[in-house]
Amino acid sequence: MKKITLLLGMALTFVLTSCSLIFGNKMTEKDGINEAKEILEKEQPFAGKEFYKVRLHTGKPLEDAFKGVTAVFKDPENEGKYISQAYWKIGKLQNPQEDSVSDNLTPFKVEEIDTDMVVKDAAELYKFLENNEELKDFNRFNVRDMTIIKWK
């Protein structure tokens, strides 16, 4: 009986530790944000670029697992136009699209994204919604998209 309980416990532990592999890392937690940063650092056409906007996505409403990232950057190969390009974890790089950028934004590198600050801001947003009586209907919602920008 002890052996069965031990095996069941080990199986349950495996399932719990594998959940992030099955469902993905939460977008509003450090692992999800670091996963997005890794894509932007290593995958083409993002590697080495400066970004004006970085959007993290879950993919569907009511999900909170990180599924993809969209970045807006200036593309020297495309006459210096602003390009928006998405990368989804299922391995699909979307076609680039022309985009526009506000004059109030300044470009930034991936290493400038403060993961701890993004996680803290997301936690503060949840707490604000939890504690605000007028917004109580939004309590227990999931963040579907997050945009990271740098103001001038």
What are these regions (language model features)?
Residues 90-139:
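Long, charged/polar, surface-exposed segments that mediate recognition or autoinhibition
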